[in-house]
Amino acid sequence: MKRTTASSSYCVHAGMLIENIKIWLVVKPLQFFYGRKRLDDKLDAMRNLPENSIGYDLAIMLDLHNLRLIPGFRNHDLNHLVLGYGMEWDDELCMQAYQVGNGYREWQCFVFLSSAIIVPTLWPMLWAHFQMGRASVSINELDFETCMMEQTVVVRERFRQCKTNSLKAGLAYAG
């Protein structure tokens, strides 16, 4: 039992480290340096879009996490909303694995995903999400600007469809 507790404690500490790296080395500097006013105005406009639209739901999601829009990361936040991944460190790692499997080749994915090396207990789950990404419709065509007025459920359904049954195989592997 002690081993499980030690493993859980390690995982919690590793998760806190990963979360702090994400917040203090990526999110906060980008929020500070990029045009706050213009993007804050955009976020305000999104809050006034129809309920259940991508734009409205994305604004609410960012508000709940005390985040703002960041240039270059708008599609990233959109992926959280559409794919249903949370914003905690383990969900973030799973989404990065999914995106790499789905053909996303942005440097941020690889940098953040590389932090998983300190949490080997997550590797089977990350592999499963990588496999789900490979089996799913490409999210590379999902665009922040063009889908703001679309209903969130419709967009989620469109991008969560799998090309094959390998999604079930990936989930079975994750246990």
Located regions from the model:
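The feature captures two recurrent sequence modes
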Residues: 1-44, 175
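Elongated scaffolding segments in large macromolecular assemblies
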Residues: 144-175
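Core of folded catalytic or high-affinity ligand/protein-binding domains
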Residues: 31-156
